[in-house]
Amino acid sequence: MAGENHTTLPEFLLLGFSDLKALQGPLFWVVLLVYLVTLLGNSLIILLTQVSPALHSPMYFFLRQLSVVELFYTTDIVPRTLANLGSPHPQAISFQGCAAQMYVFIVLGISECCLLTAMAYDRYVAICQPLRYSTLLSPRACMAMVGTSWLTGIITATTHASLIFSLPFRSHPIIPHFLCDILPVLRLASAGKHRSEISVMTATIVFIMIPFSLIVTSYIRILGAILAMASTQSRRKVFSTCSSHLLVVSLFFGTASITYIRPQAGSSVTTDRVLSLFYTVITPMLNPIIYTLRNKDVRRALRHLVKRQRPSP
């Protein structure tokens, strides 16, 4: 049955924002501008953490990996979104193209969850167990955490994509979204959704709620350590360093939780798309801005890089 559907189903149709024609033009330019800023900002973070000796610590190593994920993440989604915004009609996407986009989307989303958790662990060890920092966060340990993040994403994506795209679909279904996200595609399956729905809910709990709980636990302990510091200046420095990561975590996990955990019965297609647009397009742009504006080391490295590029008088 599934095989027959796949051979007679050459493409899905992505609704995009074709039902909101008045917004398509303005949204096109906003998304394009945000995408360009995202590419520039994350590329700059990668460059700074690579060339600046002051940023060769585990914290900035994880930040560089996060920027790499953000670059791939937006590039998987935004170009097709721009094409959809430039068309007055739903755009076709092949069965294989939809599966590939979802696969990459899941790999990068899960990897980002794991990386944000690793960054919280880095801050916890640096502040609460400084004497063990070089041991617990050695280069080998950091590489292992990053490798595990990617491997976890690959395994999860392979499982979900295999389950979802083995289901039967009706002819030429319209996905009420601007990307091949898990829930909108899964809802279009004509039968056999139960196992995939259980898999998605399990993954949501494991990769959103558990990492978020670990991050919150880390920061509760960090807050206790900050309050125990005698020096006001030390407290401000530590809080400034941690607040950037906390803000990024709140943006990412907040919008992802609302999208995947809230009851679907009362949700609307427009609300789903707006929320997804925020965490897939807006958040990757905000991350480098947040880290640059709120982190003195990054700002200092940026000024130093600019001075080096200026021609001598």
Swiss-Prot record:
The chain crosses the membrane at residues 26-46, 55-75, 101-121, 141-161, 199-218, 239-259, 273-293. Odorant receptor. This is Olfactory receptor 10P1. Residues 1-25, 76-100, 162-198, 260-272 are extracellular. GO terms for cellular component: plasma membrane. The gene is OR10P1. It holds the Pfam family 7tm_4. Its main location: membrane.
